[in-house]
Amino acid sequence: MRVSSTEEESYHQGTASMSTAGAVDDDGARFTPAPPQTSLSVTEPARETPVHAVTQVLVVGGGPAGFAAALAARRAGASEVLLVERYNHLGGLSTGGLVIWIDRMTDWSGRLVIAGIGQELLERLPAHAVAGAPRELWGSTEEDPVAYWRERQGAFRDTVTWSPMIDPEWLKYLSQEMLIEAGVKFLLHSWVAEPLFDESERRLRGVTFESKEGRRAILAEQVIDATGDLDLCARAGLEFEADAKTGGSASLIA
């Protein structure tokens, strides 16, 4: 490894940090990497990276979006789906971050308006792993139920809603089981390092990732970026939409 500098300064080994912060412009999203904290640069030696797998669909990120994308892709007929997650569990912030409250899956009349895979998962959880208003109270405006569920984040605007809280450990387990049942393969403890970008077609063709086994690559026909900040698309220079006010972004197929 060679270290170079544009200034006369020495290189000291020690704790290093890397920022992946970016700026979102007012018109949409433009990834702007944070500037380095030094003028040093490192030249890494060229190397061949072994290909761990070749798959039809690769999903990067095992949070709620990545979980649903992988499951939906397999159910839609994809022959092979592989999901890569950096932590030791699925669920993202829902499980590891303890964001276990789902805000209003019903409208003010009590009609279920957010369903699909999310509701399927909730219905498969054991009763003791989900806390929320019973179905017969959804949309109720009666004083006593509203007062009771308001204290439990289940009633708003004097209306009882389906706003469940979920046991995060059960959510980890069931998410994994549902992927296994569907035939989705997944890698945990695997941090995606770089996108493999096809300049001629302007699309992602895979990724390199790091794990206990070192750096490897995955090649795919389709890549779904389900990272929290669309890290892959940003690094590849692809355009994407983001919410300038909240910094949120949507998953993207590239």
Regions found by a protein language model. Give the residues of each.
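Conserved N-terminal/central alpha/beta ligand/cofactor-binding core
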Residues: 16, 22-31, 36, 46, ...
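Beta1/beta-strand and adjacent pyrophosphate-binding region of the FAD-binding site
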Residues: 52-63
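Core beta-strand elements of the Rossmann-like FAD/NAD(P) dinucleotide-binding domain
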Residues: 53-55, 213-222
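The conserved SAM/SAH-binding core of class I Rossmann-like methyltransferase domains
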Residues: 60, 84-85
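N-terminal Rossmann-fold NAD(P) dinucleotide-binding loop
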Residues: 66
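Aromatic pocket-lining residues of Rossmann-like dinucleotide-binding sites
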Residues: 73
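Conserved beta-strand-loop-beta-strand element in the redox core of flavoprotein oxidoreductases
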Residues: 196-217
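Glycine-rich loop(s) and the adjacent beta-strand/alpha-helix scaffold that form part
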Residues: 225-254
